[in-house]
């Protein structure tokens, strides 16, 4: 069970990192990035694609879409 004190973005990013799920990230300027999260902190996400790393600042992100359905919470109801 996920502690309620954790931020949803941290739970989401931790899940896709552990499961190595490919993401599509849209930036506020319209740029589309794809890759796998290798690390993240309060300010940025490290994205890997084709052996190259990209450091993406969270304030530049508009939308993150996983490449497949993910299960974040046990029971998977509306949280």
UniProtKB/Swiss-Prot annotation:
Give the GO biological process terms. Answer: regulation of DNA-templated transcription; regulation of RNA stability; regulation of translation, ncRNA-mediated
Residues in domain Sm?
Answer: 10-70
> What Gene3D superfamilies does its record include?
2.30.30.100
The reply on keyword RNA-binding is: yes
Organism domain of life: Bacteria
The alphabetical list of record keywords is: RNA-binding, Stress response
What GO cellular component entries does it have? cytosol
Query: Per the UniProt record, which residue ranges are transmembrane?
Result: none
Give GO terms: molecular function aspect only.
RNA binding
Quote the Pfam families the UniProt record gives.
Hfq (PF17209)
Signal peptide positions (record): none
Tell me the subunit arrangement.
Answer: Homohexamer.
Q: What family is it from? A: Belongs to the Hfq family.
* Stated role: RNA chaperone that binds small regulatory RNA (sRNAs) and mRNAs to facilitate mRNA translational regulation in response to envelope stress, environmental stress and changes in metabolite concentrations. Also binds with high specificity to tRNAs.
PANTHER family attached to this UniProt entry = RNA-BINDING PROTEIN HFQ
How is this protein named in the record?
RNA-binding protein Hfq
Cite the source lineage. Bacteria, Pseudomonadati, Pseudomonadota, Alphaproteobacteria, Hyphomicrobiales
Name the encoding gene, please: hfq
